[in-house]
């Protein structure tokens, strides 16, 4: 056992890591990556031990000042000792071997994720095992319920409360910025909680954060939705299904989104936010999570079945995901395009308008605000009339932002136009490569970074026409993005004659 004094560090240390001078552990049974229990007179937490030669003095233990739910004081003496390996580790190994987990075993895994007893390595093992081995319906139900139970829940006076959610995978998927105000303007309650980017260049929360606050508490979500009918908040700012946000932080560098976790993540948040029914958008196409209509139908069936078991009505919509939605990819570019669509929907990209209006139409029909088959028409009328823009501005102001015009959005100061190498037609836009390109430019952390598409699939182009423009706040990032673009060709241009063959 070690007795050390707390030294706060201005570092966000993952897995509750603690840093100890190597002199304090020399000749002991303590090694880097050991799981340790840190105990004070008032609290305790599990951490991962890291050693240093100079960052921390002998006799001190470095602790992140950003660590949550732990009340320590600078200079306070704490005890550091080995912690027992969590029960979850054996259950994770069981799933790695392809076995089915019981509800109690899944509950233990979720509980230990929330209490941060698992290291990122152990959590990664769990995610990869579910990605490869999968889960049956009973396992997913158990995981979903426990994820919701371990956090806060929101109760509503006015019913029904509706929601729309996209499983993502398509660059520029900014539909919610139009769909939510359309539905709210029709008199329905739609409190939307969104994630930040996981595998994409920008999540809805990243995009809206350019012009308003998205870090709302449960009470603020209720207040905004009660006042305006809707809200657009970051789910990670509240304690709704807290295991989900911990898992997302591990999924992000792995660039994976296991289907069992996808199902549980979406539906746990719906339980926690008190949703009566939801519409799930499932993009289908090359380069997204769901490759074809058959896979889309299978996932939709799982969502609907899971909803029935959880008491939430679910309808799924398969949408075209073969190329980016609209022309803007990246937080600032996307909010600019969404604002332009709200101000003048007739001049906005058809893909953005059609998707936003279609999803809103389904919700309006489910909520009785439009007759079956007329929802899309009613949604378009709300958008065209300016009521959706008015409602969007209400939501923005109520969340702490200011009314912003499209031309007021600042974009990255460093830009580069990528031009067509020849005459021809755009035969394809790679969702994956466009997303990677936007990330090379700095997305999502650099909100001014991104890609603006000058063309879409099927467009005729001449040599030297602009295919797309890269934006970044960093000249170095821009150079990296340009080099990536020239190596990978995210947009393909072909002539009518693809290849000439004479003999083999």
UniProtKB/Swiss-Prot annotation:
Q: Which UniProt keywords apply?
A: Glycosyltransferase, Transferase
Q: Which reaction does it catalyse?
A: AMP + phosphate = alpha-D-ribose 1,5-bisphosphate + adenine; CMP + phosphate = cytosine + alpha-D-ribose 1,5-bisphosphate; UMP + phosphate = alpha-D-ribose 1,5-bisphosphate + uracil
PROSITE patterns cross-referenced by the UniProt entry: THYMID_PHOSPHORYLASE
Q: Does the keyword Glycosyltransferase apply?
A: yes
Q: Where does AMP bind?
A: 169, 195-200, 204, 265, 289
Query: Family per UniProt?
Result: Belongs to the thymidine/pyrimidine-nucleoside phosphorylase family. Type 2 subfamily.
Among HAMAP family, the record links this protein to: AMP_phosphorylase
Q: NCBIfam families, from UniProt?
A: AMP_phos, ARCH_P_rylase, PRK04350.1
Name of this protein: AMP phosphorylase
Q: To which species is this protein native?
A: Methanococcus aeolicus (strain ATCC BAA-1280 / DSM 17508 / OCM 812 / Nankai-3)
